[in-house]
């Protein structure tokens, strides 16, 4: 583990990672970049993509988390998985699982941290409104045309992340 990013809208509380000196440590100190706020902050999303992509190109694993919950990191993960072509059903399931819902199906939040744009369904509707034949194309449109991420970076990321398992062989029937 050589890379760590913490999504945080407070001032930097730490200058280093608790995981050790050999772990690079970044704080996403950009306020709310969750849900609908991503459409207001394309430069911030592009910056976070570039940090992640830089580590990817170096072959460095990246551990990232939110300091107060899951909304900001869940939204960034949605963008990453979306551009990789994860199905809409799986995108929604991953996002739902990251919410650690209570028995009533709702994640209880501190009222102090509520944001009026906390609407996952609205994010998906907005992404789906972009041009493209597939949901993956629509996520790519958002990252490339709205945020200014390089299409070649996205393609290289896909090629590196979606690798067929060349060692897998179908099980042969026993004779």
Where do the protein language model's features map onto the residues?
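Ser/Thr-glycine-rich phosphate-binding loops at phosphate-binding pockets of nucleotides
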Residues: 68-73
């Amino acid at each position: 583990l050589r890379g760590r990013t913490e999504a945080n809208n407070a001032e930097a509380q730490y200058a280093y990672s608790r995981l050790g000196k050999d772990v690079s440590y970044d704080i996403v100190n950009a306020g709310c970049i969750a849900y609908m706020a991503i459409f207001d902050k394309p430069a911030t999303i592009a910056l976070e993509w570039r940090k992640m992509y830089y580590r990817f190109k170096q072959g460095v694993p990246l551990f990232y988390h939110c300091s107060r919950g899951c909304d900001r990191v869940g939204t960034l993960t949605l963008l990453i998985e979306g551009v990789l072509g994860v199905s809409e059903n799986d995108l929604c399931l991953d996002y739902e699982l990251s919410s650690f819902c209570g028995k009533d199906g709702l994640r209880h939040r501190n009222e102090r941290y509520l944001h009026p744009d906390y609407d996952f369904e609205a994010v998906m509707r907005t992404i789906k409104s972009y041009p493209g034949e597939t949901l993956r194309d629509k996520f790519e449109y958002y990252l490339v045309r709205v945020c200014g991420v390089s299409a070649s970076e996205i393609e290289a990321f896909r090629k590196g992340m979606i690798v067929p398992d060349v060692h897998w062989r179908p099980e042969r029937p026993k004779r």
